[in-house]
Regions:
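Arg/Gly-rich low-complexity intrinsically disordered repeat tracts
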Residues: 1-19
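Electropositive, beta-rich accessory/interaction domains or terminal extensions
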Residues: 18-143, 151, 187-194
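Short, structured beta-strand/loop micro-motifs enriched in basic residues and often containing a Trp
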Residues: 104-113, 156-166
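Loop/turn positions that initiate beta-strands
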Residues: 121, 176-177
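Short beta-strand His + acidic residue motifs that chelate non-heme Fe in jelly-roll/DSBH
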Residues: 133, 166-167
Length: 194
């Protein structure tokens, strides 16, 4: 915990850069088989929105599972977060596609966050949980399956709109509409995009 005065100053600074840090939508999914080049592939990238509050656990949200634990999930990748602001960019890139929240396989679609202003190690309270920013997303070929196009992975990387992963420091209940409250700013540090 940081002293209240310092917390308020840091929170004010971060909010000035990111005015309203809010959880807009929660998506969960379980492994399912899809075809890729004539072969079955297990993936959990097809996330569905949930309306109710849900428990955020050390390894994932209740109702969410990762398909390949060698590269997805674990304590440092419990939740994948994607800023809603990026959807406007992708809708211009792919005007013919329907791009609902969760299209990138994210668990949390958020507003007011940017990979350029968040530091690795920043900690937030959301709902009754405490989470920490851990790393940017490096997409695998399953993003190409979801989009039905192989060029999305390169375009995703070049766009610098990666989203980021969270570790869960304290389990708790979360729901759409919850605000992210900064409780620890990791400075000096590197941003998610560094």
């Amino acid at each position: 915990q940081i002293p209240k005065a310092k917390y308020e100053a840091l929170s004010t600074k971060l909010k000035a850069q990111n005015p309203m840090m809010k959880l807009l939508s929660i998506q969960v999914g379980r492994p399912q088989l899809v075809m890729r080049n004539g072969e079955p592939v297990s993936t959990s990238i097809y996330k569905q929105p949930i309306e109710s509050r849900v428990m955020l656990r050390t390894l994932n949200l209740d109702g969410d599972r990762q398909a390949d634990l060698r590269v997805h999930g674990g304590p440092t990748k419990a939740v994948y977060v994607y800023p809603s602001e990026h959807y406007a960019f992708w809708r211009k890139e792919f005007p013919e596609m329907d791009l609902p929240y969760g299209m990138f396989g994210e668990n949390f679609t958020v507003s007011g966050f940017s990979e350029t202003t968040l530091n690795i190690g920043d900690e937030f309270r959301v709902g009754s949980a405490i989470v920490m920013v851990t790393e940017p997303r490096m997409p695998c070929y399953k993003l190409g399956i979801r989009f039905g196009r192989t060029d999305i992975i390169k375009r995703f990387l070049v766009s610098e709109r990666s989203g980021f992963y969270l570790a869960v420091l304290k389990e708790g209940e979360v729901g759409a509409g919850d605000e992210f409250l900064l409780i620890k700013r990791n400075e000096p540090s590197v941003t998610v995009n560094d």
